[in-house]
């Protein structure tokens, strides 16, 4: 028989570091780039040439609302910390309608860090909450609250 739990793993002290919508009104999500598969950012020079600098993606609507242009340096923050990167304004991300509310997403590739052949960057998981699946202990890096401002 399989034993599983439908609840989340969240320690009491970590619950105090979860953001609130009024201060962090956007949804952050991390993802990988083909050019930087796993640790290639740190070791493969050609991939660093193809995509040399840390960036975040935002929709045209969010860019307009925040006065951010393609190529601007931005700060993305959560209750746990912040990163700085170049803004990429894209049609790939759209404003979502969730239960009648408009929701904006900030896409954050996870490959940059303090070492490697690409330009040094910030660790994307600085922003992510310390929340996980109670069965697999897999951390939740795909949906968390953030804010974004022009740097």
Say what each PLM segment does:
Residues 1-44:
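Long, low-complexity segments enriched in small/aliphatic residues
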Residues 39-151:
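Long, contiguous, secondary-structure-rich segments that constitute the structural scaffold
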């Amino acid at each position: 028989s399989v034993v599983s739990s439908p609840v989340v793993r969240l320690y009491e002290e970590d619950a105090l570091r979860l953001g609130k919508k009024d201060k962090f009104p956007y949804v952050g999500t991390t993802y990988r780039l083909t050019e930087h598969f796993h640790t290639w950012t740190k070791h493969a020079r050609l991939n660093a040439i193809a995509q040399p600098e840390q960036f975040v993606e935002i929709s045209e609507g969010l860019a307009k609302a925040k006065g951010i242009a393609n190529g601007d340096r931005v700060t993305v923050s959560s209750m746990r910390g912040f990163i700085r990167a170049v803004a990429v304004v894209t049609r790939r991300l759209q404003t979502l309608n969730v239960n009648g509310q408009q929701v904006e997403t900030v896409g954050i590739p996870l490959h940059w860090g303090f070492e490697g052949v690409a330009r040094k960057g910030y660790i994307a998981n600085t922003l992510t909450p310390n929340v996980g699946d109670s069965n697999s202990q897999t951390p939740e890096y795909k949906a968390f609250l953030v804010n974004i401002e022009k740097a």
